[in-house]
Amino acid sequence: IRRQRQMCIRDRGYAYAHRIRERAAYDWDAELSIYLAQGTHGHGVGTTVLACLIDLLELQGLRHLYSCVTLPNEKSIRMQRRLGFADAGVWHDSGWKFDGWHDVAWLEKHIGSGKPQPVTPFPALDEKNIQECLQKYMDKLNQVEE
């Protein structure tokens, strides 16, 4: 995950992951973000896309995932908790959005333990594994559309 990785869902939104810190000690940590277009919420699209991204990051050997959510946003918090994220803390009045300061919630998910191996850059992943992962979640997205 040396560079930001982004997954687009047609015209419905995107999700991406990027390094959370530059120091080598944090090579196995990533921050996730997701944006969904209006009308897409509440249909399982966000959960499906984030689950796919998490699986791809696990294939790369990442261990700790973090998500930052501008508050209030209970739907996003619930979705991430369903995926196994836990509350990690709140930064108060730290995000400027919509002409005002907002609290920002941090959530975390651990997807591995023990001594890590070097992270596998996305382009070095086995193409077959990537395609299997993407197909699994595309099938789920297609079910959402039906």
Show the residue positions of the predicted features:
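Conserved catalytic-core motifs of GNAT/GCN5-like acyltransferases
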Residues: 16, 66-69, 81, 86-103, ...
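Single conserved hydrophobic/aromatic residue that forms the stacking wall/gate
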Residues: 1-11
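Conserved beta-strand in the GNAT
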Residues: 10-19
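A short acidic/small-residue loop/turn micro-motif
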Residues: 19-21, 109-110
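C-terminal "cap" of GNAT-fold acetyltransferases
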Residues: 28, 93-143
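Conserved acetyl-CoA-binding loop-helix of GNAT-fold acetyltransferases
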Residues: 36, 42-59, 64, 74-82
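A conserved beta-turn-beta hairpin within the catalytic core of GNAT-like acetyltransferases
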Residues: 20-32, 41, 59-64
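A structural signal for short, well-ordered beta-strand segments
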Residues: 32, 67, 107-109
